[in-house]
Amino acid sequence: MTQHFPTRQLRFFLTAPTPCPYLPGREERKVFAHLPLSDGPIVNDSLTQVGFRRSQNIAYRPACETCRACQSARAPATEYILSRSERKILGRNDDLERHLVEAEATLEQFELLRRYLLTRHADGGMAEMTWPDYVAMVEDTAVRTHLIEYRRKSLDRGPGDLVACVLVDVLADGLSLVYSFYEPDQPRRSLGSFIILDHIVQAQQNALPYVYLGYWVPGSEKMAYKARFSPLEILKPGGWSLMSARERGARPPRGPGALKDACDLPLSDAQPADIEDLD
């Protein structure tokens, strides 16, 4: 798959090996590039199509020497037909209103994020995220991006309670879910799945072909929910292809330890002291 970038040649960097937080006994590395301010959206489009994810003004993807477990996943919205159970999830959240807002951080969002992280990912790399970190995650960008807030319908003229929030990039061929978080004490809503389904609906309404979901790891219990979305495409060496029934029931890659959620990669863990110039 050939991609032509419209700006000066990008410089790619490689993080130094560090202990893998997801597969005990292994090491992880990432390749990344800084998105240019001039035509960041176009470059981000091209990189996303070949498996990169965005964190602030950095595009990255796994580049582990001995492991290829992380696979990019996207839902083909134009072909997607909601199942009965998926329609029920949307129905259980019909008391929520969707609000598209500018990519500007608020304390209300940050407080929701803190509750989510402390409950769902207390031992993860983002658990210690500070307010300045959150502001940078949302606002430090050179691409087309926005926030979607899901709020209870207000009983007065003020805004309803914030229940969920997601940072979304708008691409030429779809929507890319950068990071989502939600009230952790409302399991009946299935808010994680609801956010994905609602963005598939948004993509359909706007004639956008895909919704990019980040990385999927075969056999990971925490990531098994992604395989329940069908159809789903995953990126292989030969390009994007539909996930097969066999892949949906895939066992974990062979190796020590259990898999952890590769979608919860720290959003910006490549520090200058840890990189090598690939030029």
From Swiss-Prot:
Pfam families: ATE_C, ATE_N. InterPro entries: Acyl_CoA_acyltransferase, Asp_Glu_LeuTrfase, N-end_Aminoacyl_Trfase, N-end_Aminoacyl_Trfase_C, N-end_Aminoacyl_Trfase_N. The keyword Transferase applies. It is found in: Cytoplasm. It comes from the Bacteria. Its main location: cytoplasm. Coiled coil: none annotated. Residues 245-279 are annotated as: Disordered. Keywords: Acyltransferase, Cytoplasm, Transferase. It catalyses: N-terminal L-glutamyl-[protein] + L-leucyl-tRNA(Leu) = N-terminal L-leucyl-L-glutamyl-[protein] + tRNA(Leu) + H(+); N-terminal L-aspartyl-[protein] + L-leucyl-tRNA(Leu) = N-terminal L-leucyl-L-aspartyl-[protein] + tRNA(Leu) + H(+). HAMAP family: Bpt. Belongs to the R-transferase family. Bpt subfamily. This is Aspartate/glutamate leucyltransferase. It comes from Caulobacter vibrioides (strain NA1000 / CB15N). The gene is bpt.
